[in-house]
């Protein structure tokens, strides 16, 4: 005679994708409730800024979150204007008579070619204050040009002041700090990887995670959320995107043997705080309208294996809870967003 558990498992195997997704969401919600997570504090509602990529609007957005700048002084929205010189007399002087300032030390030397040389740093190095110099050879191989472009786009950030491989807040970076790109968040040492969602190792645990995109059966309550691990994808990618491993379908079980999954599992054991940033691609009302935002420190309350949405393959799951006394999380004005899309 078939047991009730067997009938239940059989019915789950016959679920459609959407039914399985809703079932997984229900289980995630039940698990968060079982951890005793209370109701979140009242959230701050923010309208969608029109353009956050300018320095002035970025300051206004950050000041909306924390009230004042990190230095405690109110910042002026208008940029400081430099005094302009009267150029009327300069027009009377012929251009040939105007000489540019020239270094005595460089005088007589060959003019440097800055297009051949680029100072970069590796986001995963143990010594964040030591830059590595990448020299682009004039006799580079055909396949190296794409790598050079990728390095310029993702790693020419300057030298970090702080080490991202530390637990807790980064000095000088307050909760609510906003960046236009993940590269800027990496430069500030809040979340070092510019692509990967988990930063850490199996021995110490995770230092930070990024919520951006995510899995469709994860839930985000702001003060708590579930997070799905990485791995299990076909390394060849898809037919349309053969090198895009992020969009490749899952073809095998995830495992805690994966170093990044093991890092979050270790964090559940040590209960060391994990920095969390949310990105605009996250399907959540707690996601920023654009860019990426630092939402403070969370504790990994639980790590477990669960059935995913692809052919019953298993995934690594984690439950996060936000630490107290970090202020309310901002919340998107969904009505305002809908009006803009109309």
UniProtKB/Swiss-Prot annotation:
Entry-linked Gene3D superfamilies: SRA-YDG (2.30.280.10)
InterPro entries, per database record: PUA-like_sf, SRA-YDG_sf, SRA_YDG, UHRF1/2-like
GO molecular function (one): hemi-methylated DNA-binding
Observed effect of gene inactivation: Mildly decreases methylation of the fifth carbon of cytosine (5mC) in DNA; simultaneous disruption of CLR4 exacerbates the effect.
Stretches assigned to the YDG domain: 168-322
Keywords: Nucleus
Pfam families, sorted: SAD_SRA
Feature: compositional bias, Polar residues: 42-59, 115-141, 238-257
Compartment annotation: Nucleus
BP terms from Gene Ontology: negative regulation of gene expression via chromosomal CpG island methylation; protein ubiquitination
Record's keyword annotation contains Cell inner membrane: no
GO CC term, one of those recorded: nucleus
Disulfide pairings: none
Ranges of compositional bias, category Basic and acidic residues: 74-90
Residues reported in the UniProt entry to bind DNA: 218
Span list, region Disordered: 41-149, 236-257
Keyword Nucleus: yes
PANTHER family on file: E3 UBIQUITIN-PROTEIN LIGASE UHRF-RELATED, OS04G0289800 PROTEIN
Function: Involved in the maintenance of DNA methylation. Binds hemimethylated DNA.
Name this protein carries in UniProt: UHRF1-like protein
Originating species: Cryptococcus neoformans var. grubii serotype A (strain H99 / ATCC 208821 / CBS 10515 / FGSC 9487)
